[in-house]
Amino acid sequence: MEPQPKTIEEHRDYLYGIVRLKLFFLHGFLNKHPEEKFADALRNRVDIYRKTSANRGLLNPTEFFYDVEPWVSMECKAGELFELYKNDVAAFENAAFEVFKPSIDERLEKDFADKSGLAGYQCGSIRHEYENRHDPDTIHFHIANAVCPHSIFDDPNHLRDCLLQLCDHVEKDLGATKVACGTWLNQNPKWLHYFPQEWRDHMSAPNTDVHWHYGYWGQFISARGTSVPLFVRSFLQNPLPFQQDRRIIFPDE
């Protein structure tokens, strides 16, 4: 059956589900890392902020309004609930979700209509970062889904063409000889199928330091942009290494 674009009702369910999942994770993370402040974890480990009306921008805003309403009150109340329910993850998740829910609902239509997630993707489902390079010889790239509601793996030529376009652009136009990407997909055989042995040979150490971005959280979102089943909660209690930064080196001519 041909996959259909998600409806606004499905998008609302996705937002509810992913925010609940992030609250579930946050509870366990903070209990394991009591040295980290609740506000820091809420802002940096998960991306609930971007899904609320506190976010005045698009999917990836350039400005953050953490110090004004409505975020101040929501963050403060959620922190109080964590202290109250530090030993009861379900109670915290349910109560904290109700704190954010009205603000999620307020932003729902704007969030559903936002198509900016693919802005700047020069190579279909792949974009490179040229400006923020630490190593001038290496270009890091990011992955999205330009063929939603299909999976990027449905057409075997799609990712191949995206990656070939990336490599051609990086080598000929940007003058670099390496590309790198840190992503949960580096543990997916379907993804690794597109890469030569050099990609595996230049693997760096796995990284389990969870942050808000889709390099981690993307694995919990379906090709249609909906939530994946709730069994992932067991995964989040004992997360495996999700990100492996692997590099491919262009051979000398």
Residue spans for each PLM region:
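Conserved acetyl-CoA pyrophosphate-binding loop and the N-cap/start of the following alpha-helix
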Residues: 154, 158-165
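Non-catalytic substrate-recognition and accessory regions of acyl/acetyltransferase enzymes
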Residues: 1-154, 169-178, 186-253
